[in-house]
Amino acid sequence: MKTSILILAAGLGTRIKSQKPKVLQELCQKSMILHILKKAFALSDDVSVVLSHQKERVEKEILEYFPKTQILEQDLQNYPGTAGALSGFEPKNERVLILCGDMPLVEQTSLEALLSNNAKLNLAVFKARDPKSYGRVVIKNDSVEKIVEFKDANTQEKEINTCNAGVYVIDSRLLKELLPLIDNNNAAKEYYLTDIVKLAKEKDVMIKAVFVDEDEFMGINDKFELSIAENFMQEKIKKYWMQQGVIFHLPQSTFIGADVEFVGECEVYENVRIEGKSKIINSIIKSSSVIENSIVENSDVGPLAHLRPNCELKNTHIGNFVECKNAKLNTVKAGHLSYLGDCEIDSGTNIGCGTITCNYDGVKKHKTIIGKNVFVGSDTQFIAPVKIEDEVIIAAGSTVSVNVEKGALFINRAEHKMIKDYYYKKFQK
């Protein structure tokens, strides 16, 4: 049975206390709404998102990554509440999966389990450790009797710890029939989607409660809950990669972005941060190193190294206090304390301590190209644009501002001067 998916993301999110809309808050470098959309499009090609607060800003991000998403706008003034969000929604398929925009931890497998039940109305519920302000779910004889919003619950109902996860699967025809019957006769004067359960019961519709994991279906309302959710997501990411064969030393100290990929046998030491769409292939990343949007293949990086965006390393050693940016290094050794930016360095080349590619002239960035089997002495500066051909020796302390031909020795030093007995003349008068 085909499914249409609707994601509710129109709320103000005032408790998040941010100028950025709640659904654009990031976990593991990806906004909440993008995490949910990735799972939604894995299940259906008919996905809609309901927006209102900062609609243009949220819509721009959604369509950048998921251009096939249908965007709807909720009239919060006239139709507030979760049921009001469905006004104007026209599903293309036989049933509808309704999700919340602040649930980035939900797994695709859990949604598939929810969809595997063929009841006309399925409701995701969980046993809450601390029910707090969740809506309470009353279940009798394996069927949901009603959902009571916390604001409207009596003392007895507040004792119930079976709570509404806010995720529904409903027959499209049933939704179309019941939605116009929902009213706003409640304390908040809102149109509650939860009322659809009461209306379905009045029509003797079987409502199936599907129990799910509380942590996975947690909604995020403030920055504290955001941090909890990110911790859960980090644990999932690292557990997955460890099951694929990656070794993490002290994994709790390491940050791995949601889009990072590991291939083959990799080893990651403590306090490492790997971001963006980085790809690590058969490599070792040592302590306290940072890698941003870079590819590392058959190499070792660190400790205390920094690969800024667009680096490509192959068969290369990057040591401590080396920073690279937009650098392509193939079979290179850069052991310590260097900046290699906007450069290409070929096989067999050794970069001495204190080497700098001076790539910026105050207006534009320029490139340094270094060939094969080049020996670069310590404390060398390359004034880009500059090209060093194969099998060159650059003497320590040189400033290279011209191209160097193959096989040459390049030396550029100020003439030394030594004044005899100067110390005694200055201090022992």
Swiss-Prot record:
Residues reported in the UniProt entry to bind UDP-N-acetyl-alpha-D-glucosamine: 8-11, 22, 81-82, 135, 149, 164, 221, 308, 325, 339, 350
Localization, UniProt: Cytoplasm
CDD domains cross-referenced by the UniProt entry: GT2_GlmU_N_bac (cd02540), LbH_GlmU_C (cd03353)
Note describing how the cofactor binds: Binds 1 Mg(2+) ion per subunit.
Region span, Linker: 224-244
Residue numbers annotated as active site: 336 (proton acceptor)
Top-level lineage group: Bacteria
Keyword Repeat carried by entry: yes
Pathway(s) served: Nucleotide-sugar biosynthesis; UDP-N-acetyl-alpha-D-glucosamine biosynthesis; N-acetyl-alpha-D-glucosamine 1-phosphate from alpha-D-glucosamine 6-phosphate (route II): step 2/2; Nucleotide-sugar biosynthesis; UDP-N-acetyl-alpha-D-glucosamine biosynthesis; UDP-N-acetyl-alpha-D-glucosamine from N-acetyl-alpha-D-glucosamine 1-phosphate: step 1/1; Bacterial outer membrane biogenesis; LPS lipid A biosynthesis
Keyword Metal-binding listed: yes
Main localization of the protein described in the UniProt heading: cytoplasm
Protein name as it appears in the record: Bifunctional protein GlmU
